[in-house]
């Protein structure tokens, strides 16, 4: 028989830097989950990733105080900013441009994000990433 699901917790946790401080501690604590167990498991799974890269995670809490978690791919905006070499997007995205992104960089980001995107193929995923970049005030070349 399957365990009874009590709820889902969605967080963005820096890779390799999960600790019991907020936002992790309070979110897991109010469901009665073992905070340190999650932190150790998450840090072990994100060991090979770039430290500090925000990783969205969905934690499924069960009635017996156990849990499972699923890690998603890093947010597209973070990957776009890193590839374009900018700190933040433009305050006026369609008038002030803050950086440029090549098609090759957009393809690399699309390949990384492919499991979480609803795009049918790589070209559609690249166009999705290009649209996100344009909304941040980043010019996309070759698309």
UniProtKB/Swiss-Prot annotation:
One or more lysine residues are methylated. It comes from the Bacteria. One of its GO terms (molecular function) is large ribosomal subunit rRNA binding. Keywords: Methylation, Ribonucleoprotein, Ribosomal protein, RNA-binding, rRNA-binding. InterPro entries: Ribosomal_uL11, Ribosomal_uL11_bac-typ, Ribosomal_uL11_C, Ribosomal_uL11_C_sf, Ribosomal_uL11_CS, Ribosomal_uL11_N, Ribosomal_uL11_N_sf. SUPFAM superfamilies: Ribosomal L11/L12e N-terminal domain (SSF54747), Ribosomal protein L11, C-terminal domain (SSF46906). GO terms for cellular component: cytosolic large ribosomal subunit. One of its GO terms (biological process) is translation. It holds the Pfam family Ribosomal_L11. Forms part of the ribosomal stalk which helps the ribosome interact with GTP-bound translation factors. Part of the ribosomal stalk of the 50S ribosomal subunit. Interacts with L10 and the large rRNA to form the base of the stalk. L10 forms an elongated spine to which L12 dimers bind in a sequential fashion forming a multimeric L10(L12)X complex. NCBIfam families: L11_bact. Belongs to the universal ribosomal protein uL11 family. This is Large ribosomal subunit protein uL11. It comes from Bordetella avium (strain 197N). The gene is rplK.
């Amino acid at each position: 028989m399957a365990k009874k699901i009590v709820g889902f917790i969605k967080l963005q946790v820096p890779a390799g830097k999960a600790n019991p401080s907020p936002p992790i501690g309070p979110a897991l604590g109010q469901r009665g989950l073992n905070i340190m167990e999650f932190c150790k498991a998450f840090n072990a799974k994100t060991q090979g990733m770039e430290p500090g890269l925000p990783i969205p995670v969905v934690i499924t809490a069960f009635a017996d105080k156990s849990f499972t978690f699923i890690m998603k791919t890093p947010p597209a905006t973070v990957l776009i900013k890193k590839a374009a070499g900018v700190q933040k997007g433009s305050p006026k995205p369609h008038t002030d441009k803050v950086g440029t992104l090549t098609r090759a960089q957009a393809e690399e980001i699309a390949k990384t994000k492919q499991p979480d995107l609803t795009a049918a193929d790589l070209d559609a995923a690249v166009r999705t990433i290009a649209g996100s970049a344009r909304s941040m005030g980043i010019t996309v070349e070759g698309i």
